[in-house]
């Protein structure tokens, strides 16, 4: 099995702090699939403070015999997105994709060509922004050996003829434990730990620090599976922000998520946030 992409390193710990929380939002997600294999994913949310409503529609169709995937997206900002991807055709583990964005109101448009390759001990990704003035080239690679992972991510601006990103990562992963450390541009240092302590309890820890500042961030979170249909989540950071979440499967294809964010430093001042999410799948 190939290692994860650079962007997915430490994902298990990040999911502990991000999934199951919808602070300050009323959120609705709907997923469905036709008999012909076309997937529809509709999402929308309303910001409780600003009242702004945002929605998106995604359609995806796969031609399995040719490893072809066609994806189209539209959102209420009137932005159109299209992607054509081919996987495992020219070479096992190789994925080629071409994507484009277009905003009719502003006339802004851009395209990107992506290449991804995964093998037993290596995962490499690269994309080129299609720009006549000079493309921006992003590339990353992750090497894996006996649970150890080492990754590098870079970006090259052809207009300025210089590297704009230099990120390094090192980690170790097992079935129930994931350690991830990273250095971004030699200035930002971060680390995370994910531990599955039992079949029902997952725990995560995150730490980050930026050189030249005294701004250190620390957070600890957990997810506990009450039963097959219900789970609770909790997280707290060094800013005394406490997040709580509860997720309940009401029936097949219907899941309700409730969450709240409490400011521990200003508990009596109010300003705490709640979130409600409903997921429907048919």
Swiss-Prot record:
The record marks 72 as: Involved in hexokinase binding. Pfam families: Porin_3 (PF01459). It comes from the Eukaryota. GO terms for biological process: mitochondrial transmembrane transport; mitochondrion organization; monoatomic ion transport; negative regulation of apoptotic process; negative regulation of calcium import into the mitochondrion; phototransduction; sperm individualization; sperm mitochondrion organization. Gene3D superfamilies: Porin. There is a cross-link at residues 11, 19, 52, 109, 273 (Glycyl lysine isopeptide (Lys-Gly) (interchain with G-Cter in ubiquitin)). Keywords: Ion transport, Isopeptide bond, Membrane, Mitochondrion, Mitochondrion outer membrane, Porin, Transmembrane, Transmembrane beta strand, Transport, Ubl conjugation. Ubiquitinated. Undergoes monoubiquitination and polyubiquitination by park; monoubiquitination at Lys-273 inhibits apoptosis, whereas polyubiquitination at Lys-11, Lys-19, Lys-52 and Lys-109 may promote mitophagy. One of its GO terms (cellular component) is mitochondrial outer membrane. One of its GO terms (molecular function) is voltage-gated monoatomic anion channel activity. It is found in: Mitochondrion outer membrane. Belongs to the eukaryotic mitochondrial porin family. Interacts with hexokinases. Consists mainly of membrane-spanning sided beta-sheets. Forms a channel through the mitochondrial outer membrane and also the plasma membrane. The channel at the outer mitochondrial membrane allows diffusion of small hydrophilic molecules; in the plasma membrane it is involved in cell volume regulation and apoptosis. It adopts an open conformation at low or zero membrane potential and a closed conformation at potentials above 30-40 mV. The open state has a weak anion selectivity whereas the closed state is cation-selective. PANTHER family: GH26960P-RELATED (PTHR11743:SF70), VOLTAGE-DEPENDENT ANION-SELECTIVE CHANNEL (PTHR11743). This is Voltage-dependent anion-selective channel. The gene is porin.
């Amino acid at each position: 099995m190939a290692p994860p992409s650079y962007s997915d390193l430490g994902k298990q710990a990040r999911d502990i702090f991000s999934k199951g929380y919808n602070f300050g939002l009323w959120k609705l997600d709907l997923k469905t699939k036709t008999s012909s294999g076309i997937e529809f994913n509709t999402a929308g949310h309303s910001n409780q403070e600003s009242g702004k409503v945002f929605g998106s529609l995604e359609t995806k169709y796969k031609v399995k015999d040719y490893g072809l995937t066609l994806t189209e997206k539209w959102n209420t900002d009137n932005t159109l997105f299209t992607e054509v991807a081919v996987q495992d055709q020219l070479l096992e583990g190789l994925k080629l994709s071409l994507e484009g964005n277009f905003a009719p109101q502003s006339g802004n448009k851009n395209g990107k060509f992506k290449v991804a390759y995964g093998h037993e001990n290596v995962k490499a990704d690269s994309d080129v922004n299609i720009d006549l003035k000079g493309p921006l080239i992003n590339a990353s690679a992750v090497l894996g050996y006996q649970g150890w992972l080492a990754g590098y991510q870079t970006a090259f601006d052809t207009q300025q003829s210089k590297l704009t990103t230099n990120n390094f990562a090192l980690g170790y992963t097992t079935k129930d434990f994931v350690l991830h450390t990273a250095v971004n541009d030699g200035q930002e240092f971060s680390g995370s730990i994910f531990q599955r302590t039992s079949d029902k309890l997952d725990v995560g820890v995150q730490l980050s620090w930026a050189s030249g500042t005294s701004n250190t961030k620390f957070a600890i979170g957990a997810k506990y599976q009450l039963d097959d249909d219900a789970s609770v989540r909790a997280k707290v950071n060094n800013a005394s922000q406490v997040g709580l979440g509860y997720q309940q499967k009401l029936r097949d294809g219907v899941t309700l998520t409730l969450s709240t964010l409490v400011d521990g430093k200003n508990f009596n001042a109010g300003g705490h946030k709640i979130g409600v999410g409903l997921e429907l799948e048919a």
